[in-house]
């Protein structure tokens, strides 16, 4: 998803734990109900403490093999996909959440400074304009 840039449906995001809930009716009412439910429970985990999936992947050399192969095949010569993979590797292998976040921030800044960034923005908006 991150490398290919393909969108994910809300239902799939919910199933995979990317989001906590989907609003089916009034966003405001659903948001208030969601918050009241969270306030009423004793569980208030921070994102930084939700590491079950990361711990499962730690030490598995093959966990990012598919992403690396996809990047090599479909994003050859592009800078950002390698940085995305490096961010995920840091999240998996770094014990300290703050150190992992710092690495992600550094990789992101490298993407911002890379000359490909501006070219990719032009391509994106050019494709949008051409499809209208």
Question: Where are the regions a protein language model picked out?
Answer:
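Amphipathic alpha-helical segments at domain termini/boundaries
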Residues: 1-107, 125-126, 131
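Membrane-embedded alpha-helical segments that form the functional core of polytopic membrane enzymes
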Residues: 110
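Short, structured interface segments
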Residues: 113-132
């Amino acid at each position: 998803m991150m490398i290919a840039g393909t969108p994910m449906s809300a239902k799939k995001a919910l199933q995979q734990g990317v989001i906590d809930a989907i609003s089916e009716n009034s966003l405001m009412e659903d948001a208030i109900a969601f918050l009241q439910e969270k306030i009423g429970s004793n569980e208030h985990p921070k994102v930084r403490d939700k590491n079950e999936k990361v711990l499962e992947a730690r030490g598995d050399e093959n966990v990012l093999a598919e992403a690396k192969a996809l990047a090599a095949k479909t994003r050859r010569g592009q800078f950002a996909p390698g940085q995305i993979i490096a961010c995920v590797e840091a999240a998996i292998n770094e014990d300290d959440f703050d150190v992992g976040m710092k690495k992600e921030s550094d990789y992101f800044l490298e993407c911002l400074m890379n000359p490909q960034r501006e070219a990719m923005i032009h391509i994106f908006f050019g494709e949008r304009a051409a499809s209208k």
